[in-house]
């Protein structure tokens, strides 16, 4: 959800997002120090009464302003590389779900331990309850166990979409005919919202993503409920 004045990042709900916030703060500190140094140098040069018009080169200062920026780039690049590899790290996931983008909704499949499939459509304004988020609520949420390593397979059935949940630090393109994967781990219980982040047609703005992180025992109960509903639906179709 939006932060005060919409200036800060969302509260982290996953280890990856926490690392992204740390990296953001690290880079911002470096940028602020560089900016202050440049403004200070400009102020000193402008206000100085001493001008030497015949200075053509200075080997020492040229060496300094070559070496120092190189060191700064290394200081910025090393945490960036660490974070880049961390986002791609996927070690023995305990649960795998598949997310398929359609015009203009998402469908999900839980195929590891359960045979659960459902579509997730945005709730129209007339169906919202008090306190629901406008243009972000869906009829079927993605329910995941907290503190569990989850692999998400992302693809699309028609055009390119993008499966994005900012609070979890997730963004992956959904490309027709291709399976992309990302690692997900919710570090706290809560409801986290996202949207399709790739323009995909007229109703691109109406493809929300809602992830509900719950304790493991609650997740198991939800799976049993979904299986019962699917079994009941199959019986009704046979009749």
Swiss-Prot record:
GO term, biological process aspect, one: ATP synthesis coupled electron transport
Keywords: Copper, Electron transport, Magnesium, Membrane, Metal-binding, Mitochondrion, Mitochondrion inner membrane, Respiratory chain, Translocase, Transmembrane, Transmembrane helix, Transport
Chain sites annotated for binding Cu cation A1: 161, 196, 200, 207
Mitochondrial intermembrane-side segments: 1-26, 83-239
Residues involved in Mg(2+) binding: 198
Membrane topology: Multi-pass membrane protein
Molecular function terms from GO: copper ion binding; cytochrome-c oxidase activity
InterPro entries named among the record's database cross-references: CcO_II (IPR045187), CcO_II-like_C (IPR002429), CcO_II_C (IPR034210), Copper_CuA (IPR001505), Cupredoxin (IPR008972), Cyt_c_oxidase_su2 (IPR014222), Cyt_c_oxidase_su2_TM_dom (IPR011759), Cyt_c_oxidase_su2_TM_sf (IPR036257)
Residues the entry annotates as binding Cu cation A2: 196, 198, 200, 204
SUPFAM superfamilies for this protein: Cupredoxins (SSF49503), Cytochrome c oxidase subunit II-like, transmembrane region (SSF81464)
Obligatory cofactor(s): Cu cation
EC number: 7.1.1.9
One GO cellular component term: mitochondrial inner membrane
Reactions catalysed: 4 Fe(II)-[cytochrome c] + O2 + 8 H(+)(in) = 4 Fe(III)-[cytochrome c] + 2 H2O + 4 H(+)(out)
Parts of the chain on the Mitochondrial matrix side: 49-62
Localisation: Mitochondrion inner membrane
Transmembrane segments: 27-48, 63-82
Cofactor-binding details, from the entry: Binds a dinuclear copper A center per subunit.
Assembly: Component of the cytochrome c oxidase (complex IV, CIV), a multisubunit enzyme composed of a catalytic core of 3 subunits and several supernumerary subunits. The complex exists as a monomer or a dimer and forms supercomplexes (SCs) in the inner mitochondrial membrane with ubiquinol-cytochrome c oxidoreductase (cytochrome b-c1 complex, complex III, CIII).
PANTHER family: CYTOCHROME C OXIDASE SUBUNIT 2, CYTOCHROME C OXIDASE, SUBUNIT II
Function: Component of the cytochrome c oxidase, the last enzyme in the mitochondrial electron transport chain which drives oxidative phosphorylation. The respiratory chain contains 3 multisubunit complexes succinate dehydrogenase (complex II, CII), ubiquinol-cytochrome c oxidoreductase (cytochrome b-c1 complex, complex III, CIII) and cytochrome c oxidase (complex IV, CIV), that cooperate to transfer electrons derived from NADH and succinate to molecular oxygen, creating an electrochemical gradient over the inner membrane that drives transmembrane transport and the ATP synthase.
Family membership noted in the UniProt record: Belongs to the cytochrome c oxidase subunit 2 family.
Protein name as catalogued: Cytochrome c oxidase subunit 2
Organism per entry: Branchiostoma lanceolatum (Common lancelet)
């Amino acid at each position: 959800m939006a932060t005060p004045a919409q200036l800060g990042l969302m509260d982290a709900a996953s280890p990856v997002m926490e690392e992204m916030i740390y990296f953001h703060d690290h880079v911002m500190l470096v940028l602020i120090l560089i900016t202050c140094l440049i403004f200070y140098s400009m102020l000193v040069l402008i206000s100085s009464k001493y001008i030497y018009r015949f200075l053509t080169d200075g080997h020492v200062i040229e060496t300094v302003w070559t070496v120092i920026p190189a060191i700064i780039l290394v200081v910025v690049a090393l945490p960036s590389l660490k974070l880049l590899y961390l986002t791609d790290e996927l070690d023995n996931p305990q649960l795998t779900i598949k997310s398929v983008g359609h015009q203009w909704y998402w469908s999900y499949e839980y195929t590891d331990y359960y045979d659960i499939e459902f579509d997730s459509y945005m709730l129209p304004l007339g169906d919202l309850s008090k306190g629901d988020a406008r243009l972000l609520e869906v009829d079927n949420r993605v329910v995941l166990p907290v503190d569990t390593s989850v692999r998400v397979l992302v693809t699309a059935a028609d055009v390119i979409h993008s499966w994005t949940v900012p609070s979890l630090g997730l963004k992956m393109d959904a490309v027709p005919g291709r399976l992309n994967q990302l690692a997900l781990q919710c570090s706290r219980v809560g409801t986290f919202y996202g949207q399709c982040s790739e323009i995909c047609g007229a109703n691109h703005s109406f493809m929300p993503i809602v992830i509900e992180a719950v304790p493991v025992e609650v997740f198991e109960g939800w799976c049993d409920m979904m299986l019962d509903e699917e079994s009941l639906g199959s019986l009704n179709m046979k009749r």
